[in-house]
């Protein structure tokens, strides 16, 4: 019933290192299979996956909330959905150029992020307690995804002990 069989898990175990330093990651699943995506999380010793999609539904196999949560749980990663940090899908229509994304994300920073500051602090708390936390959304490029903006704000908070890595 698990996504990966014993043999595959053993291979990942060999590559997997245990890290003690706190780290914030961002990861998109566009262009990745569920297996490859989970492998990346495991190799980087991610403890918590924070899904920052407004609607955790995907037509891509394995990435709807229930499926993704099950896949994570199966390999010992805790899955948390934080829709409050997401962007309404109607605001995501008609994004043709990088400029369109910039305009959308600037408005996202001024509205959604400001209004949901507590959820940003909640993610900070998760990093402080669980050490290895990844923010996830669809887009492959963080420049075309709001998870990059969430990460930017998390990196600007005072007294942080963690570093940022884009997977």
Label for each model-derived stretch:
Residues 1-167:
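Residues lining hydrophobic/aromatic ligand-binding pockets adjacent to catalytic sites
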């Amino acid at each position: 019933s698990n996504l990966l069989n014993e043999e595959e898990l053993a291979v990942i175990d060999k590559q997997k290192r245990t890290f003690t330093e706190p780290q914030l990651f961002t990861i998109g699943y566009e262009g990745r299979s569920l297996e490859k995506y989970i492998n990346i999380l495991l190799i980087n010793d991610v403890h918590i996956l924070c899904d920052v999609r407004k609607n955790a539904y995907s037509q891509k196999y394995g990435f709807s909330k229930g499926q993704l949560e099950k896949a994570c749980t199966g390999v010992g990663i805790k899955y948390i959905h934080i829709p409050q940090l997401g962007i309404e899908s109607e605001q995501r229509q008609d994004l043709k150029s990088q400029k369109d994304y910039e305009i959308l994300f600037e408005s996202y920073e001024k509205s959604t992020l400001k209004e949901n500051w507590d959820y940003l602090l909640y993610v900070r708390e998760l990093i402080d307690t669980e050490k290895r936390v990844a923010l996830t959304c669809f887009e492959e490029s963080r420049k075309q995804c709001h998870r990059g903006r969430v990460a930017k704000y998390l990196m600007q908070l005072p007294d942080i002990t963690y570093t940022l890595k884009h997977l």
